[in-house]
Amino acid sequence: MQDIQLDKLLSADMSPENAQQVMQALSQSLNEHNIRYYVDDAPTITDSEYDRLMQCLIKLEAQFPQFIVADSPTQRVGGLALAKFDQITHLKPMLSLDNAFGEADFSAFHKRVTDKVGEVSFCCEPKLDGLAVSILYRHGVLERAATRGDGTVGEDITENVKTIKSIPLKLRGNDFPEVVEVRGEAFMPKAAFEALNERARAKDEKLFVNPRNAAAGSLRQLDSKITASRSLAFYAYALGVVEPDSYSLGKTHYEQLQQLKSWGLPVSNEIKVCDELDQVFDYYKDILTRRSDLPFEIDGVVMKVNDIAQQQRLGFVAKSPRWAIAYKFPAQEEMTLLEGVDFQVGRTGAVTPVARLKPVFVGGVTVSNATLHNADEIERLGIKIGDTVIIRRAGDVIPQIVAIVPERRPETATNIVFPHNCPVCGSLVERLEGEAVARCSGGLFCEAQRKEAIKHFASRKALDIDGMGDKVVEQLIDKELVQSPADLFKLTASMMTMLDRMGMKSATNLAAAIEAAKTTTLARFLYALGIREVGEATAANLAAHFASLDALRVATVEQLTAVEDVGVVVAQHVAHFFAQPHNLEVIDALIAAGVHWPAIEAPSADAQPLKGQTWVLTGTLNQLNRNDAKAQLQTLGAKVAGSVSKNTDCLVAGEAAGSKLAKAQELGVKVIDEEALLALFAANR
């Protein structure tokens, strides 16, 4: 395109046919120059020449909008801002990594790996401190992008990802799969972060605390124009789903990264293959030494078994691969002054001491508070108000007081005294024998507990009241509209218009969401009650075992321990909860308000043909939602596990089944497809 005389081109009358050809050529040329600049680091034209080509394309697209193509570089910034992000279910779960915090941890990981598959090489790469992103290309064109989310479901950030100039809208060349999912890290380079905060400072706006927060906030903008102004970058670090399965991929992780690079995707230049354990440690030390000089923030390095066949043999545990680990850098530490201690009250009444610190910059953020956990921790540290303390950001995330500096203790230092009465409601603070945590005895009489309990009650995994966010709950309680969860169902739209920034339309929508939440399941209801130590899985097991709330209310500790995965401690918490009159009053009020769920029929032996069996689901199911499939298998008596082992009875393999399928075949585990699973469900209705 450099040979085109742009001025003549734009001034001439051009036929639609010629315009379409020129626009396609310009798009291809600009996309190629983007890759040469951001990926190859070898630009072949100047910035001004690139700008002239771009301006030419912009003017032609304005004149012939019917010929604008999806991969045009002008389409990186979308038009209208979104109202909210849609949810995307990942075709293949986006797992997290286990951590190693020293040579001993990594050596133990290395031994586990080599004991299983023999000698290995590692592909080593910096652990970028950004946001994990999945990008799906179909026929070489960027189709969608999503955040990791909870690993199963993420948010659709396609329009924002398109604004990242280093991410190609169309893959380079023709030798790529029909469908390819690219996984990597979106991040904000240090220079871009400094420039962003400089602009904010000039406008007297709030500053971002670190590049990671800036990157996350930028990617979650509903207006992609804002994202485009933030100068984000991206490095690919793995492949996700690839279709067809027969496509020839590299046999090592490093080779696959080079394939990604050949398609025009940016890959870190700091990646290195290490064949020996000493080389891995040398790589770690080298990156750690150069950490402050790198153009981006990192919090460690990632070591992956390089051989793909060995990766498949090693497989996965519930939330992470067995063949990779994040070798974290030591947390950064600073000294500061303990100026005071505040006591906070949580949802379950836990009274937690929180240190008020002289603000100190550590690990990339300014820290002014840190939890002291409980009285035992205060005693262990021997800490007093007025002490100089050492602050560490554990894992570069959570501020933690790790020690005091005794020689700096002033004569005026004072003991930290736990309150005898709740700082919120004045009720007695109790510490049961054998427990580290002191608790307010006020229950829902305590405003702090009310707020946290009702936030939990309305949360997505509980009664899932759409629009009932934390700030709404806080206002409802502050304005004395709600005292207990049952009061939520007495709210009207007109009552909720009293809340800040709550118009009649929003209030009407929230009232409808509250009404809809009356229909739930026993498992969700039990989880929503906020019984100590009762999470989603335990609530589901309790619901399935007792089948009714009435039966559960009178269950003994002995009866409760008969429930799958319920131990003595959890059983005691459940029994104690249902023994409290004020809790029973709340439950009765909720039932009276109309909260209900379908009856659970106690399964007969014939209705549970899979009782005692362990099943595993893997790959993409086309006709079933994975959670529905899991629930139906559990109804038939099966235990649904997250990984394949010698104890697995059957693996359900959907599309792109991957390593779990290989492991099942290796162990001789029975494998069925989705059609067979549907037939099983149909036969047992």
Swiss-Prot record:
Zn(2+) binds at C422, C425, C440, C446. NAD(+) binds at D47, S48, E49, Y50, D51, S96, L97, E125, R148, E185, K304, K328. Disulfide bonds: none annotated. InterPro entries: BRCT_dom, BRCT_dom_sf, DisA/LigA_HHH, DNA_ligase, DNA_ligase_AS, DNA_ligase_CS, DNAligase_adenylation, DNAligase_N. The active site is at K127 (n6-amp-lysine intermediate). Residues 605-685 form the BRCT domain. It is an enzyme of class 6 (ligase). SUPFAM superfamilies: BRCT domain (SSF52113), DNA ligase/mRNA capping enzyme, catalytic domain (SSF56091), Nucleic acid-binding proteins (SSF50249), RuvA domain 2-like (SSF47781). Its EC number is 6.5.1.2. One of its GO terms (cellular component) is cytosol. GO terms for molecular function: DNA binding; DNA ligase (NAD+) activity; metal ion binding. GO terms for biological process: DNA repair; DNA replication. Keywords: DNA damage, DNA repair, DNA replication, Ligase, Magnesium, Manganese, Metal-binding, NAD, Zinc. Its cofactor is Mg(2+); Mn(2+). The keyword Transferase does not apply. Transmembrane segments: none annotated. It catalyses: NAD(+) + (deoxyribonucleotide)n-3'-hydroxyl + 5'-phospho-(deoxyribonucleotide)m = (deoxyribonucleotide)n+m + AMP + beta-nicotinamide D-nucleotide. Belongs to the NAD-dependent DNA ligase family. LigA subfamily. DNA ligase that catalyzes the formation of phosphodiester linkages between 5'-phosphoryl and 3'-hydroxyl groups in double-stranded DNA using NAD as a coenzyme and as the energy source for the reaction. It is essential for DNA replication and repair of damaged DNA. NCBIfam families: dnlj, PRK07956.1. This is DNA ligase.
